[in-house]
Structure formats: C-alpha cells, structure tokens
C-alpha cells in the first residue's frame, strides 16, 4: 500500500476508444493493492488487475482533464480522463510501481486466498500427474526408461527431475550429451505413440560450431533412433530459419552435422525468434487500436504485421511432426536455440494433432504441464511477471493458444473445450493469481515453494467445467487419433475474441457456440416437460389431458407455452443486430470426416436465415 498515493478519484471519464464522437462513461476510480476499479453511474464495474498492465501513459493535459491510457497484457485498452492533473499524476506513478514487481513474493498469487484449506490446496496441485501421463503412453517400456540422472538438477537445471531416455543410454552418455547441448538440454522423450514406438523428443541446439562433435551425443541420437524398431532413420527438426542456425555456428553453436550422425534426416521449418514475434504482435496491436480504418486498410495492416504467417509456420511444423510419425513411422527430435520456446510450441501442437486425449479439458492441462511448465518455458520472463529485461518478453505461449484456436475452428467436434477455456488460460498466464505459470523452470518453482504458498489454476477451471464445454464435442472424435489441418491462407482468421474481447461496442456479435448451448438447454427443458406430461397422461383414466392438468406441468415453462399454442416458432429468435454471427460462414464451421486416417474439413454446422438458427447437413 505504500505505493498508493490516491485511493479514490471522482468524476473520471472512461472513453470508448472506437467511438467517433468521444462517447464516455463518468464514474469513480478506485486504486487498491491488487486492482484498479472503475464504477460508472449505473454501478457497472470495470476491474483491472495490476499484473495485467503492460504500459501506462499520461498524455498532455486537455480542457476536459488529464488523459491516462492503460494497455494490458490481455489486450484490454482503457482511456481515462482524470479531472485534476495532480490526481492523474499520483495514479500514474502508483500504477508504474504496482504493475512491475521486483520479486516473486510480491505477486498476487502469494496473497490470493480462495478460502481453501491446506488439503484442498495440496489436492489441487496433485491433480496433474506427469508420471501417470507417461504411463498412459506406455512408458517405461522395453525401449524407454525413467532416468534419475537429473534428480538433483545436476545435469540440467531447466529440465524436470524425471527424464525419460532410451533404455540403452548409459549415464555417461546422458551427461556427455548434456555437456554438448546449449544450457545442458540434452535429447529426452516428450511423447511416445503407443503401438508404433515412434516418438517426439526434444532438446536444444548442439555446441557444434563448424566442426566440433561429441560421441556421447551421437550415441544418444542413435539410441533414440533404435528405440523405434519400426524405422531405421529419424528426423531432426530445427525450428529456426536456416540462416539463423548457420549464424549460430559462428558463435560455437549451430545444428547437427549429418556426416557425424548416422540415420538422421535433417529438416528446417523456419519459425522466427522471440524478437520477431514480439515486433509482429506490436504491429498487430497498432492496427487493432487504430480508429476509422477501412476494411482494406485493416487487412493490409494485418498482412504487414506478419502475425498470421507466423501462426501458419508454427502449425506447419507441427503437421510435419504428425505426418512423420503417422505416415513414415519415424521418430522426430525437435530443437530451436535453447529448446524452451519454439520447441515447446511444436512438440505440444504435434502431440495435440496425434493424440485425442490432449483435446480434452484435462488432457490439455496435462499437455501444458508436460511440454511447457515442466520443460522450462520461461513464463515469467516471456510474460513480464517481474520488472526485468523487456527484450525477453515475447508472445510465445499466446501463439500456441492461437494455433489451438485455429484447430478448434477447423475441427469443432474434436475438442472438449471451447474458446472461453483458451481465453481464460491466457488471462491467467499474466494475472499471477495462481502459481502454475510463475517462475522459469521447475527448479525455480520448487525454491519458491509454490505448492505450499500458492494455488493451482486447474481445479478452479474444472470447477467451472460447464462454462468451458464445447457443445459440438462428440465422443466419436475420440476414435479419430490424428488431425490434419488445412493451412492454406484462407483458413487463417483474425481472432477477434482474443484481441477485442473487451471492446463490447465494436460490432457486437453472438457466438455460434452460445446459440447452440442455448438450443441444448431448450431441448433439455422440452424433454423434461415431455416426461412430466407422459406421467400425467398415465394418471388420466380415459387418456384425456385436461386444461387444468396442462397448467399443473411447468405452467411458467416458455417452451411448453409455445408448444400449447401450436405455433411454429424460431428455435432462437435473433435480432437484426445479431445476424452477423462469427463463425457462421461455410469456411468457419466444419465437421470432421472420420472415414480416413487424417480428418478433413467439412460443411457448415449452423447457419442463420431470416433470424432463425438452423442445423444444416
């Protein structure tokens, strides 16, 4: 509280940033230890968590007051007009301090108290068991074993304690390979496909330079290849552009020399580094925040940002992994520079395409814990949790979530969770409300004692499971083991509900999923009414349903009233302003064709015609 100079300011205006006539709401601004709160004259509340604030800008004084612009990491932008410059200056300085903490213990997670006891807290952290996940894959087995070489984090500080390696890999081979890899991140198992033994492994770039080699590293890659008896070769996928990898050779790093490694096939996939991605997102946000752009100007700005091209590059790399494993039955080793950014993206998305379990709500949590949290994606640096180097901030995990969202658009029946689930996870990688995403590796999290001092996000999401369920999800999709998305350019869309989720005045739309969920609720109510009517009919000796008996069955039921009037109503009346429903075009909603090994895109699910939602085949 020592950073808060002014706790309350009245007559503050909240501007609508897309209004052409400076439309605004007048209310009171409150500053607390954790949130900035605005309450307008109608008692509507706008809460902004301090940790969500990316930047605060105090503009030049105007005749109506002092402007204060706040940009948030969850893409909310708020524009306040504070009547007095002194109050604006106090709030500005307070937010600069409160939004950038110097140490982890000052983050919200360490003071957040959801009224759970220690047992509930412990059970929440035990919800995800990675040892059980590897057992689900059939590991350990005849070819793969659990190694204790990193039990004390002596081999690699940014890897988990438990590493799965080929059974033929000895401890000297593991240690030697670690010494030859950047940050000690040696090749280890990420995913094993049951029934074929083809595997996804991950590591960092080798310290090969132009001519250096390491026999232990060569032996480890050979052991990974032999752990898959179904194929005599394996792929090594370098996720960087080739020029970047060549440049790293001059610094004593680089990529594997195929002459030194037997039975490997090398592949570059060309995903740009964190600095390019950060710049691309900034360009995208500049386009999003511009007022009065024409449609052509918006699409031109979206194209020049390069954001969707980067999303496509990440998905293409994941598709390469899936095809190598399914079509060629080949194992794949993935790396970038240090193996915690692009490597996490590609390994997790490849696993998602291959394994339907990861497309369930619980499985998706397991996937994030396995390929992102346990393998040391630097969440705190990439999300700017602390006041650190801004050059380390990059939307790597945001890109992963956006790739998943694009998959849900092409395969709406294949995912148990909906868009709101992805948005909520994105909200909490920045909120610092839960301990899951704090720190940069498992060792650091253990030192912070996060499981004792903070709470896990996952049980809270599962408690609200109904809110995040996808009404289109089909259990039949569990039989579909592999997704093959189409990455033609027309399949990539601007994720409006991510980047404009707080701009309610900007072309308001009702989502197709919301419509279908409402239709499901109506159907359930009608089924209950039918059961009650059937029970009442049985009680009638002559089988005649009297008017009094009708009113005894849910007299207030809108569905029943409609049925009794013998009208042919619309399933869901939609106002003219809601006819433009996102995802209602043929390119937006697709079913899956399960007749083939890889699924394909399918025809429209829901269309709107004359204000009526209809199912189409």
UniProtKB/Swiss-Prot annotation:
The modification Phosphoserine is found at residues 557, 585, 607. The keyword Cytoplasm applies. The modification Phosphotyrosine is found at residue 108. Residues 2-141 are annotated as: Interaction with RAB1B. GO terms for biological process: endocytosis; phosphatidylinositol dephosphorylation. Transmembrane segments: none annotated. Gene3D superfamilies: Pleckstrin-homology domain (PH domain)/Phosphotyrosine-binding domain (PTB). Keywords: Cell membrane, Cell projection, Cytoplasm, Endocytosis, Endoplasmic reticulum, Hydrolase, Lipid metabolism, Membrane, Phosphoprotein. A 1,2-diacyl-sn-glycero-3-phospho-(1D-myo-inositol-3,5-bisphosphate) binds at residues 248, 273-274, 337-342, 378, 382. Residues 124-499 form the Myotubularin phosphatase domain. One of its GO terms (molecular function) is phosphatidylinositol-3-phosphate phosphatase activity. It is an enzyme of class 3 (hydrolase). The active site is at 336 (phosphocysteine intermediate). The keyword Membrane applies. Isoform 1: Ubiquitously expressed including in heart, brain, spleen, lung, liver, muscle, kidney and testis (at protein level). Isoform 2: Expressed in testis (at protein level). Binds with high affinity to phosphatidylinositol 3,5-bisphosphate (PtdIns(3,5)P2) but also to phosphatidylinositol 3-phosphate (PtdIns(3)P), phosphatidylinositol 4-phosphate (PtdIns(4)P), and phosphatidylinositol 5-phosphate (PtdIns(5)P), phosphatidic acid and phosphatidylserine. Negatively regulates ER-Golgi protein transport. This is Phosphatidylinositol-3,5-bisphosphate 3-phosphatase MTMR6. The lineage of its organism: Eukaryota, Metazoa, Chordata, Craniata, Vertebrata.
